[in-house]
Amino acid sequence: MKKKALRKDFYMEIRKSMGRFLSIFFIVAIGCAFFAGIRSSEPDMRYSGDAYFDRKNLMDLQVISTMGLTDEDVEAIEKLDGIEKAEAGYSVDALCTEGDNQIVMHVMSLLPSMNQVQVENGRLPEKSDECVVDADFLSKSTLKIGDRVTLSSGTDKPVTDSLKEDTFTIVGSVSSPCYIGFQRGSTTIGSGNISAFLCVPEESFCMEVYTEIYAQVKGAEKLTAFTDQYDQRIDSVMKEVEAIKEEREKARYDEIVTEASEKLADAEKAVSYTHLRAHETDSYL
């Protein structure tokens, strides 16, 4: 009897304040729908991002060395059990004038198959003095396809120590799987912040050694990026790479010392020969 009276009173209260009841009902319904949408969008975003990374053959690991990297380093990494494939590339940060501003661009070489860029407008570079530029940057910049950009090193060394040319023609705009956010990284030149990336053919660089090696991990493509399973797989292979770190560092150090010693020996021979010629000339006179 009490329950029946309570129920009757409950319905009467709703009828008396139907507007307030409906307001609360719809607020709760919208909140539940919004929460359900947020919960379902997170895995959808993961799967979409992972599918995009797989299509563009995005690397799983990046190896960088201050002493530079060689073909022997690439081979050593490819021989590891957990590595599917490795490719080496070049990169350098350079200053570029855009309107009245001087900005920093991250110049990198296009790889044979990994980290494939998506052409948004124009085409990919076909010559060593052609380039493609960050699409997000180009859409807001005074620069456009067909313009020529001149780069400088921002240091006391010329940019031509790294690049064969210092001026490039923009032939397209691209997006890269390496940059999925708005930030482009930091640098030691200019303002300290990189404004955009610029891609050129590998032959545009004149460096003797690579600046980085990109590697793909066996089995990683079947896993969803940014998940615990993916991170654990990458971490396990990272330990394999770190295990050969000292060996490869020593090999590279010895190579640098040997090259320097050979150059020193050649210079000493040249000096000795010059002294000998000078002595012979004095004797003749």
PLM regions: where:
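Basic-flanked hydrophobic alpha-helices used for secretion and membrane insertion
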Residues: 43-283
